[in-house]
Curated annotation (Swiss-Prot):
Record-linked Pfam families: NUDIX (PF00293)
Keywords, ordered alphabetically: Hydrolase
A cellular-component GO term for this protein: cytoplasm
Top-level taxonomic group: Bacteria
UniProt family annotation: Belongs to the Nudix hydrolase family. RppH subfamily.
Cofactor(s) needed: a divalent metal cation
The gene coding this protein: rppH
Protein name in UniProt: RNA pyrophosphohydrolase
S-S pairs: none
Motif (Nudix box): 38-59
HAMAP family, per the entry: Nudix_RppH
Entry's Gene Ontology BP terms: mRNA catabolic process
Domain Nudix hydrolase: 6-149
Length: 176
């Protein structure tokens, strides 16, 4: 499902633990990391897509998380020209995303990146809230910045928490 401007509707998932760290997942067979995300199917709401993608990509269900907030509108990024498939119709030039901020309610052991026949990730880790901005592929960076900035006040309620989140650090990586 691609809109008239060539953008595919999509949900982005920022999953935070009780320390305000966020789940950062490694694309299978690559040294590329990102937040879980995925397309919205025809007749599916963004929230429906969120829960489907949560299950498909990291093995969690609705009872494992709590929705804290979501972005007010759609955030868009364009794909680099080399990634646009001009032979497919309609042509997809990028993604428009509704971002959700979730709180993890279950133990870390519930996260499973290998729970499907075709997993998208082969590892994950908890990282400080702002760490992904310096690590994500460049064409997604502005959307990540906008989503993280808009949602941060919903996660961090005082300046001390905010400053702790600004300390970019990696945590122990989990393999599948």
């Amino acid at each position: 499902m691609i809109d008239s401007d060539g953008f595919r509707p999509n949900v982005g998932i920022i999953l935070a633990n009780h320390r305000g760290e966020v789940l950062w997942a490694r694309r299978i067979g690559q040294d590329s990391w990102q937040f879980p995300q995925g397309g919205i199917k025809h007749n599916e709401t963004p929230e429906d897509a969120l829960y489907r993608e949560l299950g498909e990509e990291i093995g969690l269900c609705a009872s494992d998380v709590e929705i804290i907030s979501c972005t007010r509108g759609w955030l868009r990024y364009r794909l680099p020209r080399r990634m646009v498939r001009h032979n497919s119709h309609p042509v997809c030039v990028g993604q428009k995303q509704k971002w959700f901020l979730l709180r993890m309610l279950s133990p870390d052991a519930h996260v499973r990146v290998d729970g499907t026949d075709s997993p998208e990730f082969d590892g994950w880790q908890w990282v400080s809230y702002w760490y992904p901005l310096g690590q994500v592929v460049s064409f997604k960076r502005e959307v990540y910045r906008r989503a993280l900035r808009e949602l941060a006040p919903r996660l961090f309620h005082n300046m001390e928490q905010w400053h702790r989140a600004e300390n970019p650090r990696r945590m122990k990586e989990h393999q599948k």
